[in-house]
Design a protein with these regions (language model features):
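Alpha/beta-hydrolase-fold catalytic nucleophile elbow
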Residues: 1-4, 78, 116
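C-terminal catalytic histidine-bearing segment of alpha/beta-hydrolase fold enzymes
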Residues: 96-143
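Acidic catalytic loop of the alpha/beta-hydrolase fold
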Residues: 81-86, 120-122
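Short beta-strand/loop motif that positions the catalytic acidic residue
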Residues: 70, 77-79
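Proline-centered helix-kink/hinge sites
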Residues: 55, 72-74
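Short, flexible active-site loops
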Residues: 50-52, 79-82
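Mobile cap/lid helix-loop segments that gate and shape the active-site cleft of serine hydrolases
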Residues: 2-66, 87, 91-95, 103-107
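Short loop/turn segments at secondary-structure transitions that flank enzyme active sites
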Residues: 6, 76, 83
Length: 143
């Protein structure tokens, strides 16, 4: 089953925290773009880089903007508390935005956030079990 962590690119840039681990996944592209601009890879450069490769990523299409759009449909968010690619502050910002949207839609029971202790950027047995239980609850045929 596919998983993707929730994050906030904008939070990482505003707090100068965590963008290094995320850009490491795009290391060759990041370094090539920095060389083209004769710039160091720093927070300001990374913001411009994100705007070049995915316009809107740090605002219109970031976690805090996108998660609320899923309401009122069922959504389970599972993140590790030690994921260097998804700093906890950004995760919490995205989750808080989703919680507000689900509450406003009268669908708070359709949103769940599971924060796994001591988990990094990985799919644990606990996450897999929680997802299966969630799928059974929300995707099973109704009588």
């Amino acid at each position: 089953m596919p998983f993707i962590g929730v994050q906030s690119y904008g939070w990482s840039l505003r707090h100068a925290a965590g963008w290094e681990a995320r850009t490491w996944t795009l290391r060759q592209a990041t370094e090539a773009a920095a060389a083209d601009e004769s710039k160091a890879v720093n927070t300001a450069f990374v913001r411009r880089f994100y705007d070049r490769i995915a316009p809107g990523l740090v605002d219109r299409f970031d976690g805090p903007a996108m998660l609320p759009l899923i309401a009122p449909r069922a959504l389970l968010v599972v993140n590790g508390d030690s994921d260097p690619r998804s700093p906890l502050g950004g995760v919490r910002e995205a989750v808080a935005a989703a919680e507000r949207a689900y509450a406003a839609a009268g669908a708070s029971e359709r949103f769940q956030f599971l924060l796994e202790a001591d988990a990094a950027h990985e799919i644990t047995a606990e996450a897999r079990a929680a997802a299966l239980k969630w799928f059974e609850r929300w995707l099973s045929p109704r009588d």
